[in-house]
Structure formats: structure tokens, C-alpha cells
Amino acid sequence: ALYENENWVPMGFTYDCYVTADQLERVSEEERAQILCRAILLDDDQISAFGSLLEPLPDEELTNRGEDAYAADCAARRAAGVAAFTATDTGFTAKTAYDADELVFFSVPYDDGFSATVNGEPAAIEKVDDGLMAVYVPAGENEIEFTYHTPGLKVSACVSAAAIVVYGVYLLWIIRKRKSQPGSKR
């Protein structure tokens, strides 16, 4: 028989609640993942910016763990999933259709090489949940595009090309120097 994970979550979804680092530290490391399925971890600046979109996670929810609670949290994340998620050669795209403004979470590691647009306009990428990504979207239908460019790749390619040119000039100089010396083979 083939195993089927009934508690799957989509790559992109929204939350109803946020949790603080202080709250999360009160939960054992082994059980933090379950809390992060229930609420998004935001820092103080993010709470100031996006707290109006989410409710703070009540402290009693930190102890409400178990298989049934986990299954309910996963079902809630599936229900709040993006309408479509597609991997591309340079990143990924997602389509959303939420009734209200939302902070959309993606279970993709944050990296400075990512840039994002929402409906073609540049969007700030939030580093949430200790290293994953989220982006703000307004109510209604939206197209989100994340594009990845390796940081420093263009600079390193230019440096490498310059080094090849310098090496080529050096080789030409050596060849000409040897040819100009008396008694050298031609």
C-alpha cells in the first residue's frame, strides 16, 4: 500500500493568527512545528506592520497540541491555500483570491537572491518563521511572482571574464618577450 499524508499543507497559504518568539520559546523544540502550522512567527516590526491582518495567538493555544489539533491546523491551512502554485525555472508563481488583505506565507526558504512582485509591482519579501517567506497581498485576485537570481553571480562572472582577459594579455606578453630575445626559437 502507498502511504498518503492526509495532513498535507500547500506551498502557499495564509494564517489567522501570529505567534511571537517569546511565546514560541515556551514550547519544546520538538513541538514548535505544530504551533507554526497554527500561527505565523512574526517579529515586532512585522507585528506592527501586519498585526491588523492577524489575531495574536492566545497563550492557551500553545498547549492545545495533539493529533486532532494538528489535523485541524493542517485542514485550516489547506482551506487558506493559494488558488494556484507553479514552480518556474527562476522561482515560482502563485495566484490568490482572498476576500481581505492577507500576508501570504510560502514554505520556501528565505534568500536575499529572491525578489517578488504582486500584480507586476515590486513587493517586499518578509522573512518569517525563522527563515521562510511571506508577502503582503491586497484583497481580490492577485498574481505573485518570486524570481531567484544568485547573489553576486553577475559580479563574479565579470571578475572571471576580466581575469581571463588579463591572463590572455599576460600570455601574449610572455610569447612576444620570448620571440624578441636573441637566440629564441621562432
Predicted regions and their residues:
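Active-site-proximal, structured, solvent-exposed surfaces of multi-pass membrane proteins
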Residues: 44-186
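Extracytoplasmic
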Residues: 1-75, 99
